[in-house]
Every structure is written in C-alpha cells, then in structure tokens.
C-alpha cells in the first residue's frame, strides 16, 4: 500500500504538507538533521488515546485538560475536523496524521501531536483482509535534551483478520525501523490484541525489539474478550508515572505516561 501511503503535516499558519515515506529505513541509522529538543524538562509526558473519530461529546475537553501539557499526544482514529486541527496547531508545533481511509469529509487515522518538529517521519498503512479497510501507523523521531534521538511509533493495529499473519506483517516495517535506531523508543497505540495469538505475537515482537511494557496500577484500559487493547512499550527510558483516565468521551480510555529520559533502571 506504499503508493497510497503518506502523512499530512499540520503546522499553525502554514498550509497542510504531504509527507511521503523515506526511500529506505536505513536512513534512520544515518545522520538526521538537527532539531529543537522535544522537551527542555527532565520529563517527557505522553497521552495515548483512540479518540473514536471524535464521535462523542467531551473529547475536546479531555484533550484540553490532559493533552495540552503533554509533549506528545498519540491519537488513533483521529479525524481531521477543523476543531481537532485547531487544537493541534494551537498547542503543538507539529501534528502529523496518516490517513488510513478517507471518510466523506475528513480523513481518519493515527495522528501524532508533538512539542517539537520531527527530524524523521515515516507513514505506514496495512489493509485489513476481511473488511478491506486500512489501519495506519506513524514513525517519527525527535531530539532529546541529552542529544539522544527518541523514536515514537503511533499504531492502530489491524482488527479483523483470520490468524495473526496480517497482524504480524503490520509490525514488520516498524521492527525494521526500530532495528536501525540506536536511541530510546516509545511504541504505543491501539494494538487490537484481543486474542491470545495476537497478544503472543505482540509480546514476541516487543521482546525482539527489547521493549518493555508500561504497567498501570489501576488498569482501566479498554478490553475485548478480557484483554487490553491499548499499550505503551518503551526502551532507553524510565517510567515515572502511569495512569489511565476513565472517560465517556470515547470507547477507549486515554493512557497518561510520564518518562524520565535517563538510562532505564535494571
């Protein structure tokens, strides 16, 4: 699906810009252009949320109350309505969306809002074999104050498929990019891990990429068949705080995680 795969970048005061995938994932292991750090603080705050195409009331108030202080907001099923684009460009330096499919008015897909401009951007799409709808993912990279580069993966995994072949296939290009990246990584989103086989495939991928799972003490994540759908994985960072916000503003609850950029605890 490469020819139809692109990201749209929204920046305040500028026309939307189309970003195509890089020619080679190997470029991520080479010198990337310099940029401003994602955070000047000791902490990196992220919000991860399947926003349900903004179909329910109060989604904007949740973003205003909990998203505006985050350095990164990773949305799934984000529809580029004027209200969401306005919030994104008013509170973040960049907002990158990968349209999974185009609805009658506004495209829907993963969208990453960031407090700094990414120095690398790679949109990805995978088509669901049964419904023929696409799910999207986005890989971006941001400088950190300690000169390291943080890779951020925002993913909405395929939902309707027989077996886990397509599910695992969607993770392959993400794994290729993580493998070429030597710095810290955050991989988060709606993984649709509603079966034991999907969960096993996801955990196997995380182990192969040396990623840890963020644990939530009061775990109010959305579940299907008793299994959580939303996850945050990481490496090269420490988790300072992690919580789940209970809300009716979507069919998923937002995940709030605060990282410290130091070397991870053993």
From Swiss-Prot:
GO terms for cellular component: cytoplasm. InterPro entries: Endo/exonu/phosph_ase_sf, Endo/exonuclease/phosphatase, UPF0294. It is found in: Cytoplasm. It holds the Pfam family Exo_endo_phos. Keywords: Cytoplasm. It comes from the Bacteria. One of its GO terms (molecular function) is catalytic activity. Belongs to the UPF0294 family. This is UPF0294 protein YafD. The gene is yafD.
